[in-house]
């Protein structure tokens, strides 16, 4: 594999002089690394230092100053366990975000390339670095909100670093992007879904889900519809491994401590760093073989794609000369969902699936206000993080975009399905309010019900879910409309100016 050039001097951040130049004067863009829901990512070299960097090119349509202001917050972070942010440029209609380059890619990329899930030793080593990154962010009073294998990057030495803590989410919230994948809730903590207020330990729940994802190839509930998952996560018991007997007691206990439904009882990053599963983690050198294997596979695939492109171009030229007809493209379209992953227990190999289905646009870094920071400072002693009560976050999960599409369809048939959209007395009688799932998760009362009553409750779950989805949709619509009105008013003032 191509080795990055030797650094003339290590890049810490872009100088003021560099930021006043055009980005092409400061960087040599080498190749495209990938396509995200919010833009393209390129590999580039910083000319002055010779250091390899990653550049995200994000289309910007409005509120540029607000985006730049939010991105600048990332400059506060300086940790070897967090992907560094060097600066940003505005060129034409794109925002160029310059960040640290991690040559091995994300953990989910490595799993997908190798068609194998990770071993316990590999998972423990990755989790140790990830927890150190979370401990740093949480001490800085920042919540990642999008912890998953796709946002844990590895460099070629095997060091894991947290990525996209705030950038992707903040841009998503501000830009009103189009053609994005519906955000999935599989990694989200119950308190985030329930909108009851949350703090840093919401990331710990996501880390527990990520642990299962690395071990099994996908998070719990990945095989069901995301809209159903948002009701199962808060109401069901915490998820665990599909086959617990395959995993050690230490690993099982670590995941159990992450996936405690009550945030007050959930462990912090600092506490989990003392867990035996993490304390016994092996050095990062154990990751080098799987990184080398993944990078070799990636290089071979790149060569194959180049050959296929050359052959397609040759065939295209011949077809155009012969018949002037359109050349048929590959039958596999972008975004097509493949079969979900399966794993053979012996070799831990897994059939590759399209991870796009599991991609999430939910990552938004939450910055506490100055008043909250002052309160938190009073609660800190001897460098140990103390929990603080947080008010409900005024944010709209991306999976609610699904409701907007459904609402549009419903309005076009409003005259013929009004009775279905408005639950009548009969639907209310099927699941009275006292049948709602208890918030404390205590289901012991079910033992006292008759078989007939239990069957009726089970039958009522689906219509109950539909009604709760409709109520949730109406609640978010009521919150969303004033924001849209304010944005429209702001745009009109700018146009008049």
From Swiss-Prot:
What catalytic activity is recorded?
L-seryl-[protein] + ATP = O-phospho-L-seryl-[protein] + ADP + H(+); L-threonyl-[protein] + ATP = O-phospho-L-threonyl-[protein] + ADP + H(+)
Keywords assigned: Acetylation, Apoptosis, ATP-binding, Coiled coil, Cytoplasm, Kinase, Magnesium, Metal-binding, Nucleotide-binding, Nucleus, Phosphoprotein, Serine/threonine-protein kinase, Transferase, Ubl conjugation
Please name the source species: Mus musculus
* Positions of the catalytic residues: 146
Is Nucleotide-binding found in the keyword set?
Answer: yes
| Cofactor annotation | Mg(2+)
Q: Where is the SARAH domain?
A: 443-490
**Coiled-coil ranges from the UniProt annotation:** 287-328, 366-387, 448-479
- Protein's name in the database: Serine/threonine-protein kinase 3
After translation, the protein is modified as follows:
Autophosphorylated on two residues Thr-174 and Thr-180, leading to activation. Phosphorylation at Thr-117 and Thr-390 by PKB/AKT1, leads to inhibition of its: cleavage, kinase activity, autophosphorylation at Thr-180, binding to RASSF1 and nuclear translocation, and increase in its binding to RAF1. Phosphorylated at Ser-15 by PLK1, leading to activation. Proteolytically cleaved by caspase-3 during apoptosis. Proteolytic cleavage results in kinase activation and nuclear translocation of the truncated form (MST1/N).
Q: What are the Phosphothreonine sites (modified residues) in this protein?
A: 117, 180, 336, 384, 390
Q: Where is the signal peptide?
A: none
Say which enzyme class the record assigns: transferase
Give a short account of what the protein does: Stress-activated, pro-apoptotic kinase which, following caspase-cleavage, enters the nucleus and induces chromatin condensation followed by internucleosomal DNA fragmentation. Key component of the Hippo signaling pathway which plays a pivotal role in organ size control and tumor suppression by restricting proliferation and promoting apoptosis.
In the record, N-acetylmethionine modifications are located at 1
How its function is modulated: the record gives: Inhibited by the C-terminal non-catalytic region. Activated by caspase-cleavage. Full activation also requires homodimerization and autophosphorylation of Thr-180, which are inhibited by the proto-oncogene product RAF1. Activated by RASSF1 which acts by preventing its dephosphorylation. When autophosphorylated at Thr-180, recruits STRIPAK complex and promotes PP2A-mediated dephosphorylation and inactivation of STK3.
Name of the gene encoding the protein in the UniProt record: Stk3
């Amino acid at each position: 594999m191509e080795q990055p050039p030797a650094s003339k001097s290590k890049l810490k951040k872009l100088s003021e002089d560099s930021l006043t130049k055009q980005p092409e004067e400061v960087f040599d863009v080498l190749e495209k690394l990938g396509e995200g829901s919010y833009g393209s990512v390129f590999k580039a070299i910083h000319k002055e230092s010779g250091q390899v960097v990653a550049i995200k090119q994000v289309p910007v349509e409005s509120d540029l100053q607000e985006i730049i202001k939010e991105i600048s917050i990332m400059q506060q972070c300086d940790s070897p366990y967090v992907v560094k942010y060097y600066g940003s440029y505005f060129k034409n209609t794109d925002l160029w975000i310059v960040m640290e380059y991690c040559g091995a890619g994300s953990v989910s990329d490595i799993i997908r390339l190798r068609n194998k899930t990770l071993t316990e030793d590999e998972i423990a080593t990755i989790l140790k670095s990830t927890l150190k990154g979370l401990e740093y962010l949480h001490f800085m009073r920042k919540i990642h909100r999008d912890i998953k294998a796709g946002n844990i990057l590895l460099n070629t030495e095997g060091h894991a670093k947290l990525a996209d803590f705030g950038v992707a989410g903040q841009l998503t919230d501000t830009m009103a992007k189009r053609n994005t994948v519906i955000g999935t809730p599989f990694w989200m903590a119950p308190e985030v879904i329930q909108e009851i207020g949350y703090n840093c330990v919401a990331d710990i729940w996501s880390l527990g889900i990520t642990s299962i994802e690395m071990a099994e190839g996908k998070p719990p509930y990945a095989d069901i519809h995301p809209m159903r998952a948002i009701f199962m996560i808060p109401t069901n018991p915490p998820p665990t491994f599909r086959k617990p007997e395959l995993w050690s007691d230490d690993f099982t206990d670590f995941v159990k401590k992450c996936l405690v439904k009550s945030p007050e009882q959930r462990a912090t990053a600092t506490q989990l760093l003392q867990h035996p599963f993490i304390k016994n983690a092996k050095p990062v050198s154990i990751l080098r073989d799987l990184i080398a294997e993944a990078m070799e596979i990636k290089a071979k695939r790149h060569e194959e794609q180049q050959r296929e492109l050359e052959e397609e171009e040759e065939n295209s030229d011949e077809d155009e000369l012969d018949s002037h007809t359109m050349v048929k493209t590959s039958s596999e379209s972008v975004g097509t969902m493949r079969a979900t992953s399966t794993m053979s227990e012996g070799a831990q190999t897994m059939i590759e699936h399209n991870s796009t289905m599991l991609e999430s646009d939910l990552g938004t870094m939450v910055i506490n206000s100055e008043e909250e920071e002052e309160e938190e400072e009073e609660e800190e002693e001897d460098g140990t993080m103390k929990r603080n009560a947080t008010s409900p976050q005024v944010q709209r999960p991306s999976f609610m975009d699904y409701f907007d599409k459904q609402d549009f369809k419903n309005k076009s048939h409003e005259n013929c399905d009004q009775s279905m959209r408005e639950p009548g007395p009969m639907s209310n009688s099927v699941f009275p309010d006292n049948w709602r799932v208890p918030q404390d998760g205590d289901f012991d009362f079910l033992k006292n019900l008759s078989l007939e009553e239990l069957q009726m409750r089970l039958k009522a779950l689906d219509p109950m879910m539909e009604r709760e989805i409709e109520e949730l949709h109406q609640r978010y619509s009521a919150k969303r409309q004033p924001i849209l009105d304010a944005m429209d008013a702001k745009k009109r003032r700018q146009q008049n100016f």
